[in-house]
Regions:
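Membrane/wall-proximal cationic-aromatic binding patches
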Residues: 10-80, 85-95
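Membrane-embedded segments
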Residues: 56-57, 61-144
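Secreted/periplasmic serine-hydrolase-like ester/acetyl group-modifying domain
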Residues: 122-241
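C-terminal regions of proteins
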Residues: 262-263, 267-325
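Active-site segments of SGNH/GDSL-like serine hydrolases
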Residues: 235-260
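Well-ordered, non-membrane alpha-helical segments in soluble/globular domains
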Residues: 89-91, 224-232, 262-272
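Membrane-proximal basic amphipathic "stem/tether" segments
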Residues: 2-31, 141, 145-167
Length: 325
């Protein structure tokens, strides 16, 4: 053991890092600690599967849209809640080798995929423990994220609270959500209406939007230009390697969809894809009445529940012409 490694080990011991590593609070900051979601070096050494038929990218909309369980297809869901388009692109660049020639790359298109999202420490933290080489999945603040991942006591009050809970035997998983695993919608109509309004209000605050039908703000226009270039790079990356990129717009409930005016959809969704200017297949389920009118397929006004995900996934695969057994 080198002197540097010995010093780091001593520092981690006396800072409580080894105990903090065991806490649910610490584990909840990262994706794929079990190395089962992404085919990093740990996954590749433990699995023989290769030549996958399909992967999907995306943020929360993609995470809660696709479920390949029980379907005779080799596929992976690489979406996270949240996940930026840059992170989608970098995940694909690192892990695309798992795809077979001609494999599908489903790119989930959400209402604000065309606007850039500000990122911070926690965005970089998510991917720190993926076993990869080269450029990090989220390069912004990555070095700081590495330090905080190694020495979580740097989070100060949060770390101390987590450590105390652990030592008192009160450590509980803090990232488990039962709602997405349900086969029904736990919300009634009034709750769904309020939930939809919360999403609309949250998006307006996040992106500085007063009126969805108004022109883009200067900041969002700059973000749009960046996202246009990034999507072009992602599409070109797929096509240069013989993969088939596909845009997929998942459905939402009528409670939320009614706020998507034609002007809003053109400005934030279809206008963005037109600006990208690539000839990509678009599977658009935003107007699909089977999904839009059936609240029981969701766990809130926005995201599909387990039953909805399985139904939607089969529908997408069938529309791609993939034969299911």
């Amino acid at each position: 053991m080198s002197k540097d490694n010995l010093a780091q080990g001593i520092l981690r011991f006396f800072s409580g890092s080894y105990l903090l590593y065991r806490t649910s609070w610490y584990k909840s900051m990262f994706v794929d600690l079990d190395h089962e979601t992404y085919p990093d070096k740990v996954w590749l050494s433990a699995h023989d599967e290769r030549d996958f038929d399909l992967v999907n990218l995306g943020s929360s909309g993609g995470k809660w849209a696709f479920d390949y369980t029980g379907i005779d297809i080799k596929a992976m869901n690489w979406a996270q809640q949240p996940q930026t388009l840059l992170e989608d692109y970098n995940l694909l660049r690192h892990f695309h080798g798992i795809l077979k020639p001609g494999g599908y790359v489903l790119i989930t298109i959400m209402p604000f995929t065309g606007l850039n999202k500000k990122t911070g420490l926690m965005d970089a933290m998510k991917y720190v423990w993926l076993d990869i080489q080269g450029k990090p999945i989220q390069p912004f603040m990555f070095e700081k994220a590495q330090r905080y991942a190694m020495y979580p006591i740097l989070f100060k009050k949060q770390a101390l609270k987590a450590l105390i809970r652990y030592l008192m035997g009160k450590d509980k998983p803090c990232d488990y959500r039962r709602e997405p695993q349900l086969d029904y919608n736990p919300m009634d109509v009034n709750e769904l209406e309020r939930d939809a309004k919360r999403w609309i209000s949250g998006w307006k605050n996040q992106f500085g939007i007063v009126d969805f039908d108004a022109a883009l703000t200067d900041e969002n226009r700059i973000g749009r230009e960046y996202r246009v270039g990034l999507m072009r790079n992602l599409i070109d990356f797929c096509e240069e390697r013989g993969y088939k990129p596909v845009y997929v717009i998942p459905p939402v409930t009528e409670h939320l969809a009614k706020y998507y005016t034609p002007q809003f959809e053109e400005r934030y969704i279809y206008g963005y894809l037109k600006d990208v200017g690539r000839d990509v297949v678009l599977l658009d389920y935003s107007k699909d009445e089977i999904f839009r009118q059936d609240d029981s397929l969701y766990f809130n006004s926005f995201f599909l529940n387990r039953k909805g995900r399985q139904l939607f996934t089969r529908r997408v695969l069938e529309d791609l012409g993939i034969k299911l057994h």
